[in-house]
Amino acid sequence: MTEKIKNFQDLRIWQKGIEVVKEIYILTKKFPKEELYGLTSQMRRSAVSIPSNIAEGFRRYHNKEYKQFLYIAMGSCAELETQIIISYELGLSLIHI
């Protein structure tokens, strides 16, 4: 019998999202100071948005609302992917997607 997940923190996708946040913070810590309010800030916001939207959607009453927040999280993933590509192209990161 499978247990019903009662807390968003038990979701593997939320846990992976938290790992992404930590990795992005480590990566952007190495960026030049002049990027603090540019790419650094944008990448951190995009990363934080991923598990945040998963958690918020989990707390919604209807599945339709939950799905909407999952779509928003997916959009944040696409934003972050683009920003990682930009950081690579600018020579700020060795990560290539």
What spans do the regions from the language model cover?
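Amphipathic alpha-helical assembly/interaction segments
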Residues: 1-94
